[in-house]
Amino acid sequence: MITVNTLQKMKAAGEKIAMLTAYESSFAALMDDAGVDVLLVGDSLGMAVQGRQSTLPVSLRDMCYHTECVARGAKNAMIVSDLPFGAYQQSKEQAFAAAAELMAAGAHMVKLEGGVWMAETTEFLQMRGIPVCAHIGLTPQSVFAFGGYKVQGRGGKAQALLNDAKAHDDAGAAVVLMECVPAELAKKVTESVSCPTIGIGAGVDCDGQVLVMHDMLGIFPGKTAKFVKNFMQGQSSIQAAVRAYVAEVKAKTFPAAEHIFAD
């Protein structure tokens, strides 16, 4: 079974971590069998599964339900579950209560969004036995504050993002996830922190990659993001597509040049 120690050893050995979102047991079992290292029960289910316009309406009850479903299907992969909007920002104690519910539902780690200002919460959780994945850069729960889904950390804002990563690393984060960040900055962050980094639209030099399942299978309606690749193209089955994703992440051929953002 993949653990936080496994991920740390993978970073040290230069072995890339393959992560995908999963929301129910059958896909969790398929991905697990195909060699996916980490399954993310993401609040992206609000858009990918529930048909909402953002992740904000997703509830803790929703997250616990889908975490339970994924936990029934996965045998080897690590399960990371998102703390949903409004379930952890008010206080460290609120965050712990919500995280405890997700862990009881079958999560092995929880993910929270935010920079330096959330590092204290990261420390509070990890000191109480809950591993934390800190999501920085483009954080979808703050999409309305950002004014849309935009690349983060460009130009003069690069140092602030690096500070975010270091703050969470110092606080004991098990993983730092970067979304929509210039590739060179993501590389610098990865080299600057002791914990593994996972990228989505953050270049090939992160310690691992993640995509939303619906995106990598080409079944998400509407325009796809620059960092997305449809792995179903040329494949005969969903399992073959997932295996292709894992293989390309491990071989460092995904993401390619067309999937990354420059400064």
Curated annotation (Swiss-Prot):
Q: Where does Mg(2+) bind?
A: 43, 82, 113
As recorded in UniProt, its EC number(s) are 2.1.2.11
Highest taxon above the source species:
Bacteria
Cofactor(s) the protein requires to work: Mg(2+)
Which UniProt keywords are present, listed alphabetically? Cytoplasm, Magnesium, Metal-binding, Pantothenate biosynthesis, Transferase
State the pathway, as annotated in the record: Cofactor biosynthesis; (R)-pantothenate biosynthesis; (R)-pantoate from 3-methyl-2-oxobutanoate: step 1/2
Instruction: Name the Gene Ontology molecular function terms of this record.
Output: 3-methyl-2-oxobutanoate hydroxymethyltransferase activity; magnesium ion binding
Q: What's the main place this protein lives?
A: cytoplasm
Asked whether the keyword Cytoplasm is assigned, the reply is: yes
Which residues does the Swiss-Prot or TrEMBL record annotate as the active site? 179
- Might you name a Gene Ontology BP term for this protein? pantothenate biosynthetic process
Q: Which Pfam families does the record cross-reference, listed alphabetically?
A: Pantoate_transf
Taking the record's annotation, the residue ranges forming a coiled coil are: none
Q: Where in the cell is it found?
A: Cytoplasm
Q: What class of enzyme is it?
A: transferase
Cofactor, free-text remark: Binds 1 Mg(2+) ion per subunit.
Q: How does it assemble?
A: Homodecamer; pentamer of dimers.
Give the record's family classification.
Belongs to the PanB family.
Q: What role does this protein play?
A: Catalyzes the reversible reaction in which hydroxymethyl group from 5,10-methylenetetrahydrofolate is transferred onto alpha-ketoisovalerate to form ketopantoate.
This chain's protein is named: 3-methyl-2-oxobutanoate hydroxymethyltransferase
Chain's gene name: panB
